[in-house]
Amino acid sequence: MIPQSALDRLRRAPWLIRPETQQVFALLDGAGGRTRAVGGIVRDTLVDRTRETAEIDFATELKPDEVSKRAAVAGVPVYPTGIEHGTVTLKVGDLVAEVTTLREDVETDGRHAKVKFGKDWTRDAERRDFTLNALYARADGTLFDPLGGADDCIAGYVRFIGDADQRIAEDRLRVYRFFRFTASHGHEKFDPSGLEAVTRAAGSLDGLSAERVGSEMRRMLDLPRVGTTLGAMRRAGVLEFPMPLVDWLGKYERHAHRPNLNARLALLVESLGSAGLRERWRLSNDDIGSAERTLTAARLLIGFHINEAAYRFPAVLVDAIDVAAAIAGWTEAGKSAVVGHLEGIEVPRFPVSGNDLIEKGFSPGPGLGAELDRLEKKWIASKFRLDKAALLADLKR
């Protein structure tokens, strides 16, 4: 039974009543009821997990060319972002509205689907992955729930629509999505039939692109609690993580103040290496770089080079403490001792600047930068004891 409070929350949701959203409905709802908001925004509103968003998904009976024509007449920018799948994107003020024509799959290969357009809302719902994602809202906030997804959503139950094996055969990425949504919306409690289906499919995932898998894993690793889920993925044969990594991830999650993507990636880099992780999931240079810095800081903390860690990596120091604790197996007392030491130090300041070297005859450029870097490393190696005079006396021209 859907609580009345959840339905009321949907009707008065800020994202729904904002002028830009209502403008999209007015633009596309010529005969009334022809367009509905769909998916995550509706799902998360029902369980009071909405956040400020600049993007909303819509489903419509209108074909893409008609959506584009109506947008053009209204002076609304429109972009054919996924036209082969019936999707165009409208830009209404600061709202990005992804509008997709009602569809049903006519051919799938486990990665992509060929679709045909239609006007049957239930058929459109049936082609989606999980019941909690097949939820729609009209312009007035009235819920349309053809498959009982709202009850599953409220209960935190991630259930495949129809036959789980068939849903996975249509798009094998749904194996990863099953685990991610169970971690984010299912409280890490698995639907038994769904878990059996993804286990059966574990041997057929090699054809998935690293980018698509990486996107799912990145989102999963940024969730507060994923330890149970990662363990289930390993047992199902979906993830091939070595046991030390599984152990580190478990310790990290149990003791970290705010578990997050960056720290978990640092643990993965320690176990799998940067190159292996980059190849496996095609993660961005920013993600890998931040994880590497965090891991380097953690290694310094493990070696009790605490001042150096604080000086070189202040931006990732909090994550580095938790990563070091997981890798080294620190007790809470040991972790508290490191934190106490950090709180009691004053982060040193490198006493030499580029201007100092210019005054000594250096010209601006790579040579100056290299010499400044050499002096800084020498200063760090001295445990920050060398002063400005001693460093300048060591200049190499």
Kindly label every feature range from the protein language model.
Residues 1-397:
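Catalytic cores of the polymerase beta-like nucleotidyltransferase superfamily
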